[in-house]
Amino acid sequence: MWSGPRTISTALMRAWSSRPDTVVIDEPLYGFYLSRTGAPHPGRDEVIKTMNNGWRAVIDDLTQAPFPAGKTVFYAKHMTHHLLPEVDRSALRALRHAYLIRDPRQLLASYVKVRTQPVLDDLGLAQQVEIFRMFGGPVVDSSDILQQPEPMLRALCDALGVAFDPAMLSWPAGPRDTDGVWARYWYDRVWRSTGFGPYLEQAAELPPGLEPLAERCRPFYEELSAHRIRP
């Protein structure tokens, strides 16, 4: 699942991890991304120390590692901006691809609370479009999932050829052993959740300096949104 920041990506990972037939992995390219970019993210050194920092080895694990006993579905949550240019896109061909999007004004209005000067490469929209053009796959919008969790998850499962499981609609509060080591910095809200929260329509007011970025994001979002699945 190729996602951007502030798109309910961790809640969607929770939904999949609630299935008894599914194993999940949390942002497997994060260590690679931090080691290459030097981005000063919270817990950076621990992430790099505890993760595989070579993109080829990460992709090999995703495509070749055996399934744990009793598991038949493998779900990887990715932040698409971790997909740096040096990653050979053809290495992704063996995987099924899906995309989680959010209206860029809503995304930026939320993201600016944690990073005041984001740039396009922080958001992953351009990379999402790149991967979608290469491999296709279902597109889901975070607002649609929040408004209609069960119908949207059913539609997503159907698009992926996986049977829907009602267990995806709720989960126990608290951390998981599948959460990345960075979870304590970012996952407080998810740790307190027991399901998808209600959709709250909010005014997407942006600082004037971010209006040009919102406009740059808009064509990428619109291209993906034109293919979004609905119940």
Name each region found by the language model.
Residues 163-231:
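PAPS-dependent sulfotransferases, especially Golgi type II membrane carbohydrate sulfotransferases
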Residues 32-34, 107, 174:
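Generic structural signal for helix capping and beta-alpha/helix-loop junctions
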Residues 1-69:
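PAPS-dependent sulfotransferase catalytic core
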Residues 76-167, 181-192:
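PAPS-dependent sulfotransferase catalytic domain
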Residues 45-101:
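A basic- and aromatic-enriched beta-loop-alpha substructure that forms the phosphate/nucleotide-
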Residues 3, 26, 77-78, 214:
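Pocket-edge structural micro-motifs
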Residues 69, 131-137, 220-223:
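A structural motif corresponding to the C-terminal end of an alpha-helix
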Residues 1, 5, 121, 145, ...:
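Aromatic-acidic/polar surface patches that form glycan- and anion
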